[in-house]
Amino acid sequence: MRETLEALNSLGFSVGQPEMAPQSEPRDGFSNPQEKMSSRDESTLHSCSGPETPGQKEGIHTEQAEAPCMGSQACIPQKAEPASSVPGEEWMIRKVKVEDEDQEAEEEVEWPQHLSFLPSPFPTPDLGQLAVAYKLEPGTPGTLGGIALSGWAPIPEKPYGCEECERRFRDQLTLRLHQRLHRGEGPCACPDCGRSFTQRAHMLLHQRSHRGERPFPCSECDKRFSKKAHLTRHLRTHTGERPYPCAECGKRFSQKIHLGSHQKTHTGERPFPCTECEKRFRKKTHLIRHQRIHTGERPYQCTQCTRSFTHKQHLVRHQRVHDAASRTRSSPDIPATPHPPTASLAPSPTGPKPFACSHCGQSFGWKKNLATHQSLHLTEGRPFGCDECALGTNVDPAAEPSACTPHAPDCGPGSGPVAPQRTTSSERSFFCPDCGRGFAHGQHLARHRRVHTGERPFACAQCGRRFGSRPNLVAHSRAHSGARPFACAQCGRRFSRKSHLGRHQAVHTGSRPHACAVCARCFSSKTNLVRHQAIHTGSRPFSCPQCAKSFSRKTHLVRHQRIHGEAALPASASNLSAPAWSNPSEVVPPPIFF
């Protein structure tokens, strides 16, 4: 109180000295705390200066008090000074300390209740505005602290910040509870998984995940949630509410965390680096997902087969294959595809292909592959149509009869209708400047150009052999591990590459989709077609280093070298000139367009 009065005196208010209540004053005198002490009534005060007894001090009391003087000498009458001359004198109240005579119990009189009915604890206009602006509380010791009000600053909304993660809090208790997370000192541990929490309420909310308790249902759909905040966030998907706008581009988001991640695209911030390589990521989840490439972890496994995946969305997409298969088995009335031989050209090694083309009946395991395939049926940019397969082409059949050769009649026994060869589509807007080949995506063109530049950025960790694409490296690594994940459904034979399986299945189906443009002979694989075309072109790229004799096939060269006393191809054979079509999967356009 003394500090409060001194601060008010420094502001120019005339405030009297604080008066001490007598220690022996009974409690009954303060039975009504709402009595107002009027400073206009003068009363005679007596000063007791007698010898002090233990626990007694010199005090001042009024004549109206029922208790006698504590001193043995005569009391000296004195005039009582006004308690306050401030216009709002009703607000000023003395904080009285009451003691029992035996000094066994002590208590302090709290602020009188009538103060809550006053319009403002600071009646003067200037002080009242300062009290509102600086959030000063009346009666709190050290509220002003003897410092001029001009030296006080407004209290920030969250003044306490964490040094570890830069989060801010309104009070120190919440800050200390939060800092336990960084130190791993959670006092409340989950008995099921051992996870620690700073507060018991958070631990109880977490235990709902173990019990499967979801007490908050969505009124729009059948989903349920364990927290009300999660339900509120989910409801925005139905209402379309996006309350968090980006200040840079105006894009709006339904969650604040999504806005924070989006803003990093403007700042270029990537705070999460990979410890194995030099890549950096905007989200920690992206870093964790990327690190599975280095560790080989595949945490998402299909419950119906043995396949596993690195991403959850890949597992969900894969499970649609099983769902479509179960629907097909449960619905026998589903009509068959119009062209069974075409649809069975490349069956999936892991299950059915639920996405069928409505034009030709060819089936696909993924919907995006079906969309890419259906672009072949577009007539825009293909003015010349084929009478057999209804596919368009850019070449006039009258000028070039072999423009649509897959339907040649002399394709061998059992060939039947074959899959049409894919020609350049109007949607292939990326063309190679070296060979003119077109691609639908820029990344496919960049991958193709490595054939011309000779770039091979992917190296095998076992033997050091390098490859131009990651799929080729993955397929090569199966040669070291012995993995053969692609099995034939007819004979059970297994293969390390899907293309090898498709080529093998042509043996069972009798399909020969690759026809020679010169003699109309058909082949089951494009490799055999390219090898056959060397007969018409006269190409003999494999030459013997000892007699200069050349051959069209490498196996013929190896067999010839046995004449010279060599049982196998010598080590120097690696320096032989390789044929232009030695790797047909890279040089010759593949029959399937991605």
From Swiss-Prot:
GO cellular component: nucleus
UniProt xrefs under SMART domains: ZnF_C2H2
Zinc fingers, C2H2-type class: 160-182, 188-210, 216-238, 244-266, 272-294, 300-322, 355-377, 430-452, 458-480, 486-508, 514-536, 542-564
Role: Transcription factor that promotes adipocyte differentiation and suppresses osteoblast differentiation in the bone marrow. Enhances the osteoclast-supporting ability of stromal cells. Binds with STAT3 the consensus sequence 5'-CTTCTGGGAAGA-3' of the acute phase response element (APRE). Transactivates several promoters including FOS, OSM and PPARG. Recruits a histone deacetylase complex.
PANTHER family hit by this protein: ZINC FINGER PROTEIN, ZINC FINGER PROTEIN 771
Family assignment from sequence similarity: Belongs to the krueppel C2H2-type zinc-finger protein family.
Protein name per the record: Zinc finger protein 467
